[in-house]
């Protein structure tokens, strides 16, 4: 099941293990369903339990007792939605996002580079580049800005992944991206 090349040619149902667990199922039960891949979330795992703790535990797979594929979403959507909620305070600019978690009051910074570092500490098989996720009813000009920022961030993620970790050839991990653009197909 660790043949990540299959992901390039096949579709997978990936249950949401946002915080390192699929709700209402044990890892054993999840395996019994035939599930081959799960999706976790960089932002939520950054906040709790934290990438350093996950790394000390041997990565998300050991922490969960999971031997399938793990895709880790970059956290772009969560940053967008949580910063614009009343509980979270923060900002997004060309460098990335800065925000304060109401959970424990800590301030975090998520940049394209730190997103890759966190996903590597988590031990993800498929890393997702940080994206500038915005509301879907944007004016076309704002959507274009979001697409341009997402592309810039994706390039920064890729450059960091290759420079610091040796890229896919050295790590065996895949790097992918999220397509933005609101409701504008072009």
Positions of predicted regions on the chain:
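Glycine/Thr-rich beta-alpha phosphate-binding loop at enzyme active sites
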Residues: 141, 160, 171-186
């Amino acid at each position: 099941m660790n043949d990540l090349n299959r992901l390039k040619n096949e579709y997978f149902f990936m249950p949401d293990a946002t915080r390192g667990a699929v709700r209402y199922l044990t890892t054993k039960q999840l395996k019994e369903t035939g599930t081959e891949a799960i999706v976790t979330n960089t932002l939520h795992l950054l906040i709790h339990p934290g990438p350093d703790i996950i790394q000390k535990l041997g990565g998300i797979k050991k922490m969960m007792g999971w031997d399938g594929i793990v895709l880790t979403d970059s956290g772009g959507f969560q940053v967008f939605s949580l910063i614009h909620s009343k509980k979270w305070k923060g900002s997004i600019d060309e460098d990335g996002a800065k925000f304060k978690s109401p959970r424990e009051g800590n301030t975090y910074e998520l940049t394209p580079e730190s997103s890759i570092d966190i996903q590597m500490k988590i031990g993800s098989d498929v890393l997702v580049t940080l994206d500038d996720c915005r509301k879907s009813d944007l004016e076309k000009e704002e959507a274009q800005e979001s697409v341009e920022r997402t592309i810039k961030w994706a390039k920064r993620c890729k450059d960091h992944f290759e420079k610091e970790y040796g890229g896919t050839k050295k790590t065996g991990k895949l790097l992918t991206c999220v397509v933005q653009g609101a409701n504008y197909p072009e």
